[in-house]
Amino acid sequence: MVAQGEVRSGSMTQIAASDDSKRSAKWQERREAIVDTSARVFARNGYHATGIAELCEVNGFGKGAFYYYIGSKEELLAAIHDRVMDEVMLGADRVAEAGGSPSAQLAMLGEELLDVIHRYPDHVWVFLHEFPALTAERADQFRERRREYERRVEAVLRDGIATGEFRDIDPWLTARAWLGMHNYTYLWLKAGGDVSARDAAKPFADIFLHGIARPTGGAPA
């Protein structure tokens, strides 16, 4: 989790759309719809294989109108990344506010993350596969936002080690094992599927927490 008083880095799209707050609510709504529709196209075709003409067609805009809402194709990619990170960080904030033991917080973080993956499968596909296409400052901001979330997970693990709840594990490596376990559910965790985010969250937590828990009696593993 982020330490008290730490300033969170802003969304990448603030670079190219710093005047968004001056736009109308209708403009924002239409822009968000473009982001969502384009995420589906990128997830189906890939970012580099998708041209502006196709994006205009699926969104029902001419090129001039499209650029009124989206400054560039890369800005659109950044907005998709921001959609994922905004939702993930909101979930992490809810976990921090709820408090509880390190085990409870790690389980809640998992449920929140799986919920985002379940609700935004196309955005998450783009997030995981197309981030190398971000350049310069956008790439730097994405890495920092991703690292901020990783620090939250690592902090929960460190708390568990400090209290004796978890074994003496490497927080950095363990966080990445935890993230890998959850992130790639995008391959099969689909809205309307047989398994919901909540269905997956409990067994995931059980498997992971049993793996890192200190054995009963406090004997070192």
Task: Label the predicted regions.
Residues 33, 37, 41-75, 79:
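Helix-turn-helix
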Residues 86-93, 137-162, 172-176, 199:
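Amphipathic alpha-helical packing segments from all-alpha helical-bundle domains
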Residues 125-128, 169, 219-221:
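Short, hydrophobic secondary-structure boundary micro-motifs
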Residues 1-18, 112-115, 119, 150-162, ...:
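C-terminal peripheral helix-coil segments that are non-catalytic and often amphipathic
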Residues 79, 93-122, 174-178, 201:
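Hydrophobic alpha-helical connector segments
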Residues 27, 35, 77, 81, ...:
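Amphipathic, non-transmembrane alpha-helical scaffold segments
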Residues 105, 117-137, 187:
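Amphipathic alpha-helical segments used for helix-helix packing
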